[in-house]
Amino acid sequence: MPVEYYLWLASILFGIGLLGVLTKRNALILMMSVELMLNAANLTFLAFARRSGDVAGHAIAFFVIAVAAAEAAVGLAVVIAIYRSRGAINVDEVRVLSE
């Protein structure tokens, strides 16, 4: 399978994630959109690693996955804490820093 197919898929996934970040106001949807964008970047790293035959792309993708898992855990904990204290997870309704 040509590498260009992987790059097209990665760009489509990144576009869907970017669309979710720009249009949605739900904190969970925003987190999922960011994760989708990170996975698109991982797919790009892996596609170029496959083309060059180097394992550096695989190592970078592995570390991005680890950072994304930590980001998701911390972000979900923050969203749950905000929901428990405010009763909403809409980013327009919740202004934590202003109060």
UniProtKB/Swiss-Prot annotation:
The keyword Signal does not apply. Belongs to the complex I subunit 4L family. NCBIfam families: PRK05715.1-2 (NF004320), PRK05715.1-3 (NF004321), PRK05715.1-5 (NF004323). NDH-1 shuttles electrons from NADH, via FMN and iron-sulfur (Fe-S) centers, to quinones in the respiratory chain. The immediate electron acceptor for the enzyme in this species is believed to be ubiquinone. Couples the redox reaction to proton translocation (for every two electrons transferred, four hydrogen ions are translocated across the cytoplasmic membrane), and thus conserves the redox energy in a proton gradient. The gene is nuoK. GO terms for biological process: ATP synthesis coupled electron transport. This is NADH-quinone oxidoreductase subunit K. One of its GO terms (cellular component) is plasma membrane. It comes from the Bacteria. It catalyses: a quinone + NADH + 5 H(+)(in) = a quinol + NAD(+) + 4 H(+)(out). It comes from Anaeromyxobacter dehalogenans (strain 2CP-C). InterPro entries: NADH_UbQ_OxRdtase_chain4L/K, NUOK/Mnh_C1-like. Keywords: Cell inner membrane, Cell membrane, Membrane, NAD, Quinone, Translocase, Transmembrane, Transmembrane helix, Transport, Ubiquinone. It is found in: Cell inner membrane. One of its GO terms (molecular function) is NADH:ubiquinone reductase (non-electrogenic) activity. Gene3D superfamilies: 1.10.287.3510. NDH-1 is composed of 14 different subunits. Subunits NuoA, H, J, K, L, M, N constitute the membrane sector of the complex. It is a multi-pass membrane protein. Its EC number is 7.1.1.-. The chain crosses the membrane at residues 2-22, 28-48, 60-80.
